[in-house]
């Protein structure tokens, strides 16, 4: 079983022989407490490193274990692309790009570029991101003529990847 606690901000994690202890603060009341658990799952996404246990057995905590990658998705009206369900494509650099039809729109993504700002600086969608995905669409659907005016929405997110020094995102 599990206990889910809403509005609780994790301020620390400790490991011990029987599992772990998580220090939390109630975001509404400001009350602090700790929670003991047989198993602690750190599912904090791009913030995962900030919640490593203080006695983490991985050695040097100053060396980043993760590399953040920015991923951008575009949304176009469904009628602009001949996609009934899903299509996997390749961009000019060989990366996979998908188009997924859902409801009245089609989602197109994703980019994979290095994000150096840290998780506290959420990435923005840039003109270069949009152009990259539109070029991928044009490679596979040249007759569709999808352009910047067809993008009705977009968003960027962060993916935590295992840090591999010297490897591009």
Spans of model-derived segments:
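A conserved short coil-to-beta-strand element within the FAD-binding core of flavoproteins
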Residues: 6-21
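Short, hydrophobic/aromatic-rich segments at coil-to-beta transitions
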Residues: 18-23, 83-85
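Beta-strand residues in well-ordered beta-sheet regions across diverse protein folds
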Residues: 23-25, 109
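Core beta-strand elements of the Rossmann-like FAD/NAD(P) dinucleotide-binding domain
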Residues: 28-39, 43
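Flavin (primarily FAD) binding-site architecture
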Residues: 42-59
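C-terminal catalytic lobe of FAD-dependent flavoproteins
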Residues: 56-108, 113-169
């Amino acid at each position: 079983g599990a206990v889910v606690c809403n509005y609780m901000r994790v301020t620390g994690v400790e490991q011990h022989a029987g599992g772990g202890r998580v220090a939390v603060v109630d975001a509404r009341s400001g009350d602090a407490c700790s929670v003991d658990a047989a198993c602690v799952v750190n599912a904090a996404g791009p913030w995962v490193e900030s919640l490593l246990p203080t006695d983490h057995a991985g050695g040097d905590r100053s060396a980043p274990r993760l590399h953040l990658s920015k991923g951008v998705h575009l949304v176009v009206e469904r009628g602009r692309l001949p996609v009934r369900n899903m299509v996997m494509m390749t961009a000019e650099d060989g990366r996979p790009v998908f188009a997924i039809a859902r409801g009245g729109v089609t989602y197109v993504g994703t980019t994979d570029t290095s994000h150096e700002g840290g998780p506290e600086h959420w990435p923005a969608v840039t003109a270069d991101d949009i152009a990259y995905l539109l070029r991928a669409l044009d490679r596979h659907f040249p007759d569709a003529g999808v352009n910047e005016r067809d993008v009705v929405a977009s968003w960027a997110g962060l993916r935590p990847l295992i840090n591999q020094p010297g490897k591009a995102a």
